[in-house]
Amino acid sequence: MNTPSNKTNHYKLLFICLGNICRSPAADAVIHRLVESKELSHKFSIDSAGIGNWHVGDLPDRRMREHGAKRGYNINHIARQFNKVTDFDASDYIIVMDDDNYSEICVQAKNARQRSKVVKMKDFFSRHKGETSVPDPYYGDAKDFEFALDLIE
């Protein structure tokens, strides 16, 4: 595990998906609640971003907000695009949802130190060890949104 980029043991997590309207804002909300429930909010900064700019300024997809709300999550992050100039240096971990996200973010890294911050969400799966990614539910149905949340949790 990388050490925090500062001396206060404060970890900065950045979740990445394609458009920042489904998976990464859901991960942001899930991890926020987990950290709060463990009374560790003072040790984490959590954010999310998208690779593309299509949805910048938008709320998360309505379906993800609805499915998240059924589980008690407030998925309300305003979409933004990943910024290689600031986000690599501002983050201790950049957690991507799938292999395409991983490749795209790693290509933007200017050195090995930045690349070492990029990890896959699947590396944290405890109940779904056979899964290789968090599939994008955007073109799917209700079960796809539920499955994405299952994996993220």
PLM regions: where:
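Phosphate-binding/catalytic loops
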Residues: 2, 93, 99-153
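Small/polar loops that bind or transfer phosphate-bearing groups
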Residues: 23, 96-97
